[in-house]
Amino acid sequence: MIPGEIMPKEGDITLNEGAEAITLMVANTGDRPVQVGSHYHFAEANAALEFDRDAARGMRLDITAGTAVRFEPGQRRDVQLIPISGARRIFGFNQQVMGDL
């Protein structure tokens, strides 16, 4: 083994396998771009984003960890959301939950 060497497992890796996804239409009603990261509690995203926040409660974007989705001003797009897993406790963000979901 070489220090820093990556030895990937054979075959394909399926991200978020088994997670029940929902699709929401999101519109950026603001005058600036908005970017939302992979593990951000989507319901608490920037107020300029217009979407069903109740449906997004406890959900995050169904994208690769460490990536983000950018919404340009006036842009509308569908996004897939999956449930936040683990202990399902939310702290920080816009402080709308601050505990168990």
UniProtKB/Swiss-Prot annotation:
It catalyses: urea + 2 H2O + H(+) = hydrogencarbonate + 2 NH4(+). NCBIfam families: PRK13203.1, urease_beta. Its EC number is 3.5.1.5. Belongs to the urease beta subunit family. One of its GO terms (cellular component) is urease complex. It comes from the Bacteria. It is found in: Cytoplasm. The lineage of its organism: Bacteria, Pseudomonadati, Pseudomonadota, Alphaproteobacteria, Rhodobacterales. One of its GO terms (biological process) is urea catabolic process. This is Urease subunit beta. Heterotrimer of UreA (gamma), UreB (beta) and UreC (alpha) subunits. Three heterotrimers associate to form the active enzyme. Pathway: Nitrogen metabolism; urea degradation; CO(2) and NH(3) from urea (urease route): step 1/1. CDD domains: Urease_beta (cd00407). Its main location: cytoplasm. It holds the Pfam family Urease_beta. Keywords: Cytoplasm, Hydrolase. Gene3D superfamilies: Urease, beta subunit. GO terms for molecular function: urease activity.
